[in-house]
Each structure stands twice: as structure tokens, then as C-alpha cells.
Amino acid sequence: MERDVMEYDVLVVGAGPAGLSTAIKFAQLNKKNNTNHSICVIEKGSEVGAHILSGNVFEPTALNELIPDWKDKEAPLDTPVKKDIVKYLVNENISIPVPLPGFFMPNFNNHGNYIMSLANFCRWLAKEAESLGVEIFAGFTASEIIIENDQLKGIVTGEMGVSKDGEKKPSYQPSMELRAKYTVLSEGCRGHLGKQIIKKFNLDQDKDPQHYGIGFKEIWDIKPKLHKEGTVMHTAGWPAKGCLLYTSPSPRDMS
């Protein structure tokens, strides 16, 4: 099957924090070395951030290194953590406060961290990437990898405008090849392209299987008098193994 082909120097699959940070770093190196390598990011969501549902307690060390002037550029890190709380839940009515020994549990110390929407952060990263010359294409899925001479040469996008019955709609667009000298897969946990790479090169041979945990996210509306901006709480005990709670700037803006 003949397909249209677009070629880049760097192709990043997935516009999450890792993929966008990768594209930004490549673009910064372009500027530093006075080069003009083409960089493309594709994202399956209708827009950057569309598939990023999580809030986040964000540790900014990596961002300080990548974009030192992020405050001047108005990165959406506007809720600094003000208080950490650790509690053991006995049941639905009783909890026991646990002193916070930062030396023994440094991950429970969020001083200097920020509460934020990860989707908004990705949108901000996308704007930064585009300002550096990165091309970002949202709404494009990557259906398969292109392997030639045992090297990853790019990806094939999925067809667009196909009905549930497999019929081509008036908006149909055929798949195309995106080829690059360097292809970076940033599609997240258990991505289907990653599975293809693992199978092709037997990367899991004689390896222990990966382990995964299931987490559930809930957004709670609480009474304004109970809302304490910048609070992070870790729990253990009832009803399962524990949870992480944090307050947004207001009860409804952690989209």
C-alpha cells in the first residue's frame, strides 16, 4: 500500500510531560548549536492534555533544569504545598495522626512542591515547544512501527474518518508514514507501540514480567470552610492500602 510520507529528524510519539520535555530539549539544543533539525510530536488526543486526567503534586527540580524561567513564562504551578499531613485510618470515623519524620519518609515531605493540573501543565509545555519551532499534531494515532534493517525508522498513523462498521466516511483520511532519524516513544505505560518493539527485539526474554498497580481518582466537592488550599495528606489503613489527597486552588478547577 502506498502512503504519503513525512520526514523529520526527530519524531516524538505522545504529548505527555515526558514527550513534550524531550521535544523541548531537542529544540533547545537546536538553538544552542545553531542547527535546524526538524522536530515533530504526535498526540492521539483531540488536543494536548485531552487524555491527561490526573492532578499532580509536582516536584519542580527537572523543570528548573529544563526551563529555568518557568515562573516568568507563567507555568501553571500556582498552588505551592503549604502543609503535609499523614494519618492512619482505623475506620470511617477514626483516624490517628502520624508524626511526619521527614528523614525517614522524605517522599512525604512536599515542601517546595506544587499542586497542579497535569493537563494544564502539558498544554503549557506544548506552547513552549511550539515557540521553539516544534510541530505538534493532535488527533493523530500511531498504529504501528516501521522497522527496516532492524532499526526503528518511524511510525504509521491510523486511518481517520472510519465508522464503527469499518465504512469510510466523507471525512476519511488514509494512514500515512512519519519517518525520522530518531523516534522517541512516549506513549505511557503498556503502550501498543512499546509492545511491538518488545516483541520485535525480544526485550522481555528472560526478564521478570512488569508489575502494575491500579489507582482510582476521585474529585470531591467539599464545603468552603473545609477547603485548605495547599494541603497534601497521605493515609494508610482503612479501607484499603491508603491514598493521597490534595486540595486544588478551588474545589472545582482541577480539570
What residue spans do the PLM features occupy?
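Flavin-dependent oxidoreductases
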Residues: 199-200, 214-245
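Glycine-rich, N-terminal phosphate-binding loop of Rossmann-like dinucleotide-binding domains
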Residues: 15, 187-188
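Active-site catalytic pocket residues across diverse enzymes, especially alpha/beta-hydrolases
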Residues: 29-30, 197, 201
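N-terminal Rossmann-like FAD-binding beta1-loop-alpha1 element of flavoenzymes
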Residues: 10-35
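Single conserved hydrophobic/aromatic residue that forms the stacking wall/gate
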Residues: 246, 251-255
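Secondary-structure boundary motif
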Residues: 28-32, 131, 253
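Extracytoplasmic/periplasm-facing segments of secreted or lipoprotein envelope proteins
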Residues: 170
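Conserved N-terminal/central alpha/beta ligand/cofactor-binding core
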Residues: 3-5, 35-164, 174-182, 192-195, ...
